């Protein structure tokens, strides 16, 4: 009998032949600067745990206390009986932190982006979107069935031209960008985009997943970083990266949040966060405000490691943040570099097409606030040794 799914196995074999097949690495310890993967202790440069909060004592204690008091789950979606006092307290905490009227928490950052874009727009509306926006934004745009207009990466003039072309046409306009782009580590041109949105009456939305806890005062994100409070209508963030736990959120006006309560499908049809998650997220925002030295250490480590990679002869692209790619070109080369690094005690993930464009494959590195200079020096030594052996060292780009 023919297997109707046989083509899946054929595709997997093709990826293996091309050297782009990826096996899941298994974490066998805490997610820390040095961690154990697949039975091997390595320097971890593949985690989004920017500030080391996954193991912070205050978050651990908050999770344990919430579990003791409320149990391990809510038992329902938010709109039936799954809204706990902890969920409301977390949303109010985030809203104060972000200086907005209200906030709603989603089960993931992906759900927050996709669910929000799909909820607030209709097929009669228009979306103007950066070509390198996150997959969750792209999927949300598709789900909305709105008309999608893509502009070249960070080209504010092109974005404004596209908005101008839509002036007078039926439907609403949404202008959307990442705050920090997850593959290249560059910062979105939010001031110019905000001006364009205001000029043409568009909704302005930013995905701050990789800038929450990284940019702005105490990690408030790109809106704070650029001083644009009150001028960005929809702010999306994550609780899974610098916050160190799980989930995503949307911030904005009270009307926006109440609308999402009624129309955002991931919110409507997913069980709410466990009490431990909500409580530990609240503790994380306290840490952001009370331990700003963590963010300073993150940036000190970022500058040190980025400078070391460039000095060794690696192409780190246009990175401006802790996300630092080592661009090598072909996907096979990126995966070979990642595998060789792991064998020598460094975990950094190889990334190729379709996550990044053809010919722009890279090994993505992220340093954290908890890496020591000794660990970073060891990682740089391994990168230089492996890069030389594989013949991928290049001159610094102009």
Regions inferred by a protein language model and the residue ranges of each:
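Conserved PLP-anchoring active-site segment centered on the Schiff-base-forming lysine
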Residues: 116-135
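Conserved N-terminal alpha-helix of the aminotransferase class I/II PLP-enzyme fold
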Residues: 61-109
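PLP-dependent enzyme catalytic core of the Aspartate aminotransferase-like
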Residues: 2, 57, 61-65, 69, ...
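Conserved PLP-binding catalytic core of the aspartate aminotransferase-like
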Residues: 296-305, 310-345, 355, 359-360, ...
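Active-site phosphate-binding strand-loop segment of PLP-dependent enzymes
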Residues: 149-206
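N-terminal "arm"/small-domain region of PLP-dependent enzymes with the aminotransferase-like
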Residues: 4-70, 202
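Active-site C-terminal subdomain of aminotransferase-like
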Residues: 200-203, 210, 215-320, 330
């Amino acid at each position: 009998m023919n297997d109707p799914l046989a083509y899946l196995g054929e595709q997997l074999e093709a990826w293996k032949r091309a050297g782009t097949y990826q096996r899941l690495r298994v974490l066998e310890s805490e997610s820390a600067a040095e961690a154990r993967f697949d039975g091997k202790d390595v320097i971890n440069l593949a985690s989004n745990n920017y500030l080391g909060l996954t193991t912070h004592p205050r978050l651990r204690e908050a999770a344990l206390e919430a579990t003791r008091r409320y149990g391990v789950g809510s038992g329902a979606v938010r709109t039936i009986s799954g809204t706990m006092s902890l969920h409301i307290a977390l949303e109010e905490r985030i809203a104060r932190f972000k200086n907005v009227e209200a906030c709603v928490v989603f089960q993931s950052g992906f759900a927050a982006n996709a669910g929000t874009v799909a909820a607030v727009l209709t097929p009669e509306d228009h979306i103007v979107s950066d070509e390198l926006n996150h997959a969750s934004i792209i999927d949300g745009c598709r789900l909305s069935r709105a008309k999608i207009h893509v502009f070249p990466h960070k080209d504010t003039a092109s974005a404004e031209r596209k908005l101008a072309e839509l002036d007078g046409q039926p439907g609403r306009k949404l202008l959307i960008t990442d705050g920090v782009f997850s593959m290249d580590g560059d910062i979105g041109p939010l001031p110019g985009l905000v001006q364009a949105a205001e000029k043409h009456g568009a909704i302005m939305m930013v995905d701050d997943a990789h800038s929450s806890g990284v940019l702005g005062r105490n990690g408030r994100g790109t809106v704070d970083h650029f001083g644009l409070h009150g001028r960005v209508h929809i702010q999306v963030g994550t609780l899974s990266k610098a916050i160190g736990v799980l989930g995503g959120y949307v911030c904005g006006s009270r009307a926006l949040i109440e609308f999402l309560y009624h129309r955002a499908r991931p919110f409507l049809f997913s069980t709410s966060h466990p009490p431990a998650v909500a409580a530990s997220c609240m503790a994380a925002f306290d840490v952001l405000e009370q331990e700003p030295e963590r963010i300073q250490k993150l940036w000190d480590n970022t500058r040190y490691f980025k400078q070391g990679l460039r000095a060794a002869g690696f192409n780190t692209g246009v990175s401006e943040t802790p996300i630092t790619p080592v661009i090598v070109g072909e996907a096979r080369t990126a995966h070979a570099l990642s595998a060789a690094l792991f064998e020598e005690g460094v975990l950094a993930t190889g990334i190729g097409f379709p996550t990044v464009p053809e010919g722009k494959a890279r090994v993505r590195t992220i340093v954290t606030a908890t890496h020591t200079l000794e660990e970073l020096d060891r990682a740089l030594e391994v990168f230089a040794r492996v890069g030389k052996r594989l013949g991928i060292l290049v001159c610094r780009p102009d």
